[in-house]
Amino acid sequence: MSSSHRTPGPERRAAPGVTHVLVGFSKGVLADLDDLLPAGAVLVLDEPDVIKARGALEKAKAHPCVAGIMAAATQDEPHAERLTELLDRPPRVQAVIPAVEYGVVGAAVLAHAWGLPGAGPAAARTLRDKIAMRAAADASGLAQPQWAIAETVHDVEEFRERHGGRCVLKPANRQASLGVRVLGPDDSAAEAWQHCTHADEPMLRARYALPGRYLVEQRLNGPEVSVEALVHSGQVGFTNITAKAVQPGTSPVEMGHVVPAGLAPGVEASLAASVRELVRITGFQYGVLHSEWILVEACRPHLIECAARLPGDSIDLLIDLAYGGRFTGDYLAVLEGRGPIPPRQKRGAAAIRFLTAPTGTVREITGRELASALPGVQEVTLSVASGTTIAPVTSSWSRPGHVIATAPDGRQAAQQAAAAASLITFEMDEEMAWP
């Protein structure tokens, strides 16, 4: 770690009551931990840039579980071992939790150094780098799209030509579909390259963070699913399969999820075997794996990507609603070394539907109360308000809100969520065409 990445400060010690260290600031994870841990139990580590950009010091005051926030070079992945020079092992520490994608490596390194359960540094580094993950999957024979490293737009054009005029371009170390572009024969590779290589998350990433790397992949056809698996000592325990709906067009952003997916038993067995193989080839030890797959011919899993952290898009809440219990609590149990989490039976189904809106400036949003009153609706959330300018949805961060609903089965839950979402209307001061 260069001196410019160090965060000087007199404190190497956490507050006496700290039992859990969170690598990365996440309001969602902290809200869960407020319910699961006593006040003052959590120390949050994050980049100085991110702490400032997100107003984390002020926002943390709303979370009783937070003992403090410490600035640290959590995203300096090549030198993550130096995090141990910043912070002494808290005497009562029970777990280190990666709260965000960019904290996965730092959390794994701290857990390993402190003798606590974690992903393992090597596994974390593989799973944070889509190129490394693709290479590991190729070496094991795990089914996945054909792929290549892309260093120029010419690489994209050549790959597309070799694969029937279709491909997917993506960053190797981002999240939330940020920068991902789906290309057909007539789509501009130059425009896609410009979009992909300039996509960033300045609110979430340090200014010095690793430079972008890119890969281009074969486009596969078939339903998309994700698998959320709790792993203990390299063994897969509780597992859920989530069905996904992805918006059409060049930006494949997820617009809905259903838990559980309700697949045929044979397909579920194939996915389970693929996840076990993914655990084996990465050497993943303790935590949660959120892996995404395309079912070619609706039955053959092909790996798309995998994250070694809690899933986003409220999938953890959908799991809670469909199975009972607390998925985040089970995750803590694994990271605290309290043993494996066994499979359990579903008791219903849950679905999330993300809202869509015209592009332009919002004048008024109506229908929220009507949507909330529908049977089975559990949550209606808006992420925009009057005066907000809405752009096209190009990543998970640009969706204007969502609805969550429950029902006895997945089809009904999805229908209820869609019906509620249809009642919410965005009135615009002016609708605008977007370049």
What is each residue range found by the language model?
Residues A333, G339-G376:
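A glycine-rich beta-turn/hairpin centered on an aromatic-Pro dipeptide
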Residues C196-T197, G367-R368, Q416-S422:
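Short amphipathic alpha-helices in soluble, non-transmembrane regions
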Residues Q218-F284, V288, L295, L303, ...:
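ATP-dependent carboxylate/phosphate-activation module, predominantly the ATP-grasp catalytic core
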Residues A137, R160-V182, E201-G222, V227, ...:
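ATP-grasp fold ATP-binding core
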Residues A113-G179, E201-L204:
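A conserved helix-loop-beta module that forms one wall/lid of the active-site cleft
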Residues M1-A123, H154, G339, A357, ...:
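ATP-binding N-terminal substructure of ATP-dependent carboxylate-amine bond-forming enzymes
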Residues A143-P145, R166-L169, D186-N221, P252, ...:
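Conserved ATP-binding module of the ATP-grasp superfamily
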Residues L289, A371-I390:
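A structural supersecondary motif
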